[in-house]
Amino acid sequence: MSSNVIKVRKAEGKIKQLIQVGANSFFADEPEPVGNGQGPNPHDLLDSALGACTAMTVMMVAQRKQWPLQDVRVEITHQEDDATYKLVRKIELVGTLTEEQRAYLMGIANKCPIHKALHKKLEVESALVG
């Protein structure tokens, strides 16, 4: 599966970066004193990818099944040491769902593309250009 080319360039500020994803753009930064606190930091971006993907995947399945899911609220935190980066995900399903529907949607949460990607062997290939 191919993806958008993500472009990252320095923006105005200490270390603030402009991130362009297709036609969309946003900033990443670090809090003071390292940065200016004008955007999420890279860890927050990684963590939020899982949260957004979880909510979108669960909502899409519930809509397809015409279940009364009004909202999916996801809270992500992480814990890190030298050997492990642990994401803790709490999911709230808002709506008058049966226990069976809730259990099914919790299983779907683990099938979101980012959750699956984070459980694969990850490789990062870097090349110096220019």
List the model feature ranges, each with a label.
Residues M1-S48, M56-G130:
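Extended beta-strand/beta-hairpin segments
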